Amino acid sequence: MLFKFEGDKIKIITAPRKFITINLVVSDYQKKFIEEWKNGNFKIGEVIIKKDSIIIPFKKVVNPKNFEHIMTIDINEKNITYSIFDKDGNVIKTTRLDVYKLKRIHENFSKKREKIQKKLSNKPMKLKTLMEKYSGREKRKVEDYLHKISKFLISEALKYNVKILMEDLTNIREAVNKKSKNFRRRLNRWNFSKLQFFIEYKAKWDGLDVEYVNPSRTSKLCPICGCKLDPNGQRLLKCNNCNLVFDRDVVATFNLFKKSQDVGSFRSPERSLMKSSY
């Protein structure tokens, strides 16, 4: 179909030099996209015309950035740890975000569902309706929280002009299935892949590159010499060969960088691990 989009209307060509004009009713939210199109930041995709509506997809024109630093992100059940390196392997910054709010969201809705099940056990239709209602609310709250986390991480990525490295979690389900039932339940609630999707989407929207790295043994090996790390107290791991002690979450971000760059050493950051609740 040949057409000409003019912002507030669309002209559909029916024959040479003949066309029909359709005036568009747009909301204030949709007007923002039209303004971006007028400014040359968006392109028009394939228009779909239905009986009562017209779907006009916009495509953002993205110019890929030349990165100056590298950001590695390790996503855990209780926290998200990220490190930023320069291209020589010097650690510029390492931060751990505690994501306890996510656990609280799941726990609160789990308690609500238990109460509903007990109260309406003899009213299956009403029970089903309410369970679906609260499941929807839980999903929206979780996604809103994940959006906020990913937005913060991308703001950090833009500040340092980075390429982002994350774990390739393609086979995470197979690994999780070998764990206990309680562990599987907790991990199924924590949607790692959805957070990664939000991060990648926002990163590419701003022209940042994203790569995935095989996470095998990233939390078990010394990033300096490659020897196996041994437990050395709460959340700490020690390399008996290098005689160095690492935070278990931080070492994963170091090894992600090492795997992607094939480098053998790191220079410690000037300041220690920064902690933050999100």
UniProtKB/Swiss-Prot annotation:
Its GO biological process annotations read: DNA recombination; transposition
Q: Which InterPro entries match?
A: Cas12f1-like_TNB
**Which GO terms fall under molecular function for this chain's record?**
DNA binding; metal ion binding
What are the alphabetically sorted keywords of the record? DNA recombination, DNA-binding, Metal-binding, Transposable element, Transposition, Zinc
Instruction: Tell me if Metal-binding is a UniProt keyword of this record.
Output: yes
Q: Which SUPFAM superfamilies match?
A: Rad50 coiled-coil Zn hook
Q: Which residues bind Zn(2+)?
A: C222, C225, C239, C242
Source domain of life is: Archaea
Q: Which family does it belong to?
A: In the N-terminal section; belongs to the transposase 2 family.
Q: What is this protein called?
A: TnpB-like protein MJ0751
Organism of origin is: Methanocaldococcus jannaschii (strain ATCC 43067 / DSM 2661 / JAL-1 / JCM 10045 / NBRC 100440)
